[in-house]
Amino acid sequence: MHTHYKDRNSTVIGVIFLILLLQAVIIVSLNVKIGRSVHHAGEVKQQEKQLNRTIISDLHTFPVPAAFRSEITYEDSYGAGRIQGSHEGCDLLDTQNTEGRIPVVSATDGEVTNIGWLYLGGYRIGITAPSGVYYYYAHLSSYAGGMEVGKKVQAGEWIGFMGSTGEGEEGTKGKFPVHLHFGIYYQDGTDEKAVDPYPYLLKIEE
């Protein structure tokens, strides 16, 4: 009788011990995961700060000359819904909606790494700054002379005129108001990611 009682006690104690051990393992595992998450969040925050500093350092000039600044409007439309995905830039609109009227200049020093027609972007130029960040100018009506892949450009250099090209085969225009679509992209490993240009445009204008 007493032996069975002791056996039952031993079994209960063993089960309790296993439960406590399992709880301890779960708590340690959760703490490790939380620690990793906090560390990862800290790394991401640091990377964002570094990217912000890089872009601020890259941008020297507003992409529209000062003489035409009062003749454009823009707002933060980054992330707005589009037919294909979301808007990955900021649109600077010509208040007179006239094709080829307002010149577009490079906001950074850099090298032309893309030029030509895109179905959605129309006539566009992509300029990669020395930092590696990519600056994208789309819907141009035409290019400045000598613009080609490999050309070195300086901030403030004329690269083309604002237009309404795109959303069709080469030469398509007029499907939307005349504007410059200005985009900023950076490499995150093998992925190219967009950045909201709006706050940087505001900062350039300060």
Show which residues each predicted segment covers.
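Surface-exposed, glycine-biased beta-strand/turn segments
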Residues: I27-Y123, A155, G168, E205-E206
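N-terminal Sec-pathway targeting helices
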Residues: H2-Q23
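A generic structural motif
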Residues: Y119, S141, T165, P197-L201
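Small beta-barrel nucleic-acid-binding modules, principally OB-folds
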Residues: Q84-N97, G126-V133, Y185-V195
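Short hydrophobic beta/alpha edge segments that flank linear recognition/processing sites
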Residues: R124-I127, Q154-E170
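Acidic, glycine-rich catalytic/binding loops that coordinate metals and/or anionic ligands
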Residues: H60, E148-V149, Q154, F161, ...
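Short, charged helix-to-loop "capping" segments that act as catalytic/coupling loops
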Residues: D94-S106, S141-G150, S164-V178, Y186-E192
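Zn2+-dependent peptidoglycan hydrolase active-site motif and core
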Residues: S106-E148, K173, P177-V178
